[in-house]
């Protein structure tokens, strides 16, 4: 059987610096290959080189064969003609892949109409509507991309790439930002694509996703393959020290953090309720935040976690209730965005953006180098624009930017969703160490239940319950509204074993509670 993808001796250079060295891989019909490794290790560079859309400042070498079409890695024009029909890409930044001016239903419909063309007797509109419904997006057909949560935008992009019918799928962090139930469904859809004969190249930091997809796995570190083999073998009995450390660094193995110590009140919210697009997200939420406090925020994709943060930060007015803030500095409340690319000026170097920030708020630039060292970032990285660094590196730069202003409250919206497990641990340690030194409160949005439980016993949980129970939680003395956690989502492995579990959907309508 001929291969759908063959990569030989792929290398990528930025001037004299080697970013990727002698990468090789082969994929046949129905096979899966998953790339794991540190942020900035070169995983996305492999996908970009295969697609032929590397940044102009980078130089590629090696040979890439897609089906019967063979070309040198630097001959990008030869592969761009295969986009959509032979290669489908699910990008790491879904908002950048969607037309910001077009409703999502029409975007999927156009893929069926102009790219697929052989989709069968059903109309493109019907196929598009069914595709969105299958991914839990009923009622969102007329929404524009900016009206969707990060997880919803990821699912729309996923529906578009599957609609193309391309035999080779490249999925760059396909489950990033999704709750556990939707992650299970996306993995199930990827496995179905494999059963239908697609070849699948996946980039992920989620080792459970890698294990569920099976096939082969390659581990990259500093642009080189350090280990490869059958997924079950590599993840259960890793040989390379980096792979061993990566497997051991999952949040479920972390020691719990000590409880919060009582401190001065920063913010109090009473009876908060909010709707978006005619949908009630939450209501009756009472919440107080004290200096130095840690609170985890969790719930299904699209349930209002980011909206809650925007309310607390003063970026949106609440539909119901009131918020009293005891921090008066204009930069005292800071946000780490789920998609950091959208939070930086695209044509400025990162250094210029950070220097301008320091000048605006009269902060010493000298602190920047120390923060970069703590976050494992080289100073030379700042000479690039936002598009010239990986998503994980950019998120760490965003964290450095927030810490420069010494905020009283940080709303961290999935700040480690782009990071490998080791870098996630390092980044959260820096965040917590800096927050503790400055008595900054941190609200952490996460879909990882292990990470949420490690971070804090106080959890804001947005789900479908009609109203929160406002009894006190004596276990940690919190004065938040409290309610028990929603029913547990089955493990990914179990969800993939049974059709019933694979079809489980997280509820959509969401009052709020805190545990």
Regions found by a protein language model. Name each.
Residues 71-88, 114, 233-238, 324-334, ...:
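ABC ATPase NBD coupling module
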Residues 84, 164, 196, 405:
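Conserved signature/switch motifs of ABC ATPase nucleotide-binding domains
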Residues 93, 100-114, 346-360:
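Q-loop/switch helix immediately C-terminal to the Walker
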Residues 131-146, 371-387:
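Conserved ABC nucleotide-binding domain
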Residues 158, 186, 399, 427:
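Hydrophobic anchor residue at the start of the ABC signature
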Residues 204-205, 445-447:
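H-loop/switch region of ABC-family ATPase nucleotide-binding domains
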Residues 223, 464-465:
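Conserved ABC ATPase "signature" C-loop
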């Amino acid at each position: 059987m001929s291969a759908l993808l063959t990569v030989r001796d792929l290398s990528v250079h930025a001037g004299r610096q080697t970013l990727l060295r002698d990468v090789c891989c082969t994929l046949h019909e129905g096979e899966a290959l998953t790339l794991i490794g540190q942020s900035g290790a070169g995983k996305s560079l492999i996908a970009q080189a295969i697609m032929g859309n590397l940044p102009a400042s980078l130089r590629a070498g090696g040979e890439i064969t897609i089906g019967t079409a063979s070309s040198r890695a630097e001959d990008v024009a030869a592969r761009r003609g295969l986009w959509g029909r032979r290669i489908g890409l699910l990008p790491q930044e879904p908002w950048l892949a969607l037309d910001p001016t077009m409703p999502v239903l029409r975007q999927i419909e156009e893929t069926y109409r102009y790219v697929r063309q052989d989709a069968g007797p059903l109309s493109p509109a019907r196929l598009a509507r069914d595709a969105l419904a299958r991914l839990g997006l009923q009622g969102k057909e007329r929404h524009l991309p900016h009206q969707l949560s990060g997880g919803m935008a990821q699912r729309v992009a996923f529906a578009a790439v599957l609609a193309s019918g391309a035999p080779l799928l490249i999925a760059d962090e396909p489950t990033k930002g999704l709750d556990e139930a939707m992650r299970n469904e996306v993995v199930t859809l990827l496995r179905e694509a494999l059963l239908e004969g697609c070849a699948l190249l996946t980039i992920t930091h989620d080792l459970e996703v890698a294990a569920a997809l099976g096939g082969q796995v390659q581990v990259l570190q500093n642009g080189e393959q350090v280990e490869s083999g059958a997924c079950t073998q590599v993840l259960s009995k890793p040989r390379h020290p980096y792979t061993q450390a990566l497997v051991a660094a999952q949040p479920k193995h972390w020691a719990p953090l000590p409880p919060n110590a009582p401190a001065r009140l920063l913010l109090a919210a009473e009876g908060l309720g909010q709707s978006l697009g005619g949908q009630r997200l939450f209501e009756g939420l009472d919440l107080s935040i004290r200096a130095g406090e840690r609170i985890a925020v969790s719930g299904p994709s699209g349930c209002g976690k980011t909206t809650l943060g925007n309310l607390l930060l003063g970026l949106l007015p609440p539909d119901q209730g009131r918020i009293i803030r005891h921090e008066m500095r204009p930069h005292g409340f800071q946000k780490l965005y789920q998609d950091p690319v959208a939070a930086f000026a695209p044509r400025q170097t990162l250094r210029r953006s950070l220097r301008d920030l320091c000048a605006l708020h009269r902060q010493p630039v000298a602190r920047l180098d120390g923060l970069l060292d703590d976050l494992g970032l080289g100073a030379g990285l700042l000479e690039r624009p936002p598009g010239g660094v990986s998503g994980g590196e950019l998120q760490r730069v965003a964290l450095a930017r927030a810490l420069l202003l010494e905020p009283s409250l940080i709303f961290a919206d999935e700040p480690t969703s782009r990071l490998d497990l080791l870098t996630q641990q390092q980044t959260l340690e820096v965040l917590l160490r800096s927050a503790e030194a400055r008595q900054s409160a941190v609200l952490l949005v996460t879909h990882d239940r292990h990470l949420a439980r490690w971070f804090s016993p106080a959890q804001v949980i947005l789900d479908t319950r009609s109203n929160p129970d406002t009894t006190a939680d004596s276990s940690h003395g919190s004065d938040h509204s409290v309610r028990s956690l929603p029913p547990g989502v089955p493990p990914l492995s179990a969800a993939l074993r049974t059709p019933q579990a694979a079809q489980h959907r997280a509820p959509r309508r969401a009052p709020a509670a805190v545990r």
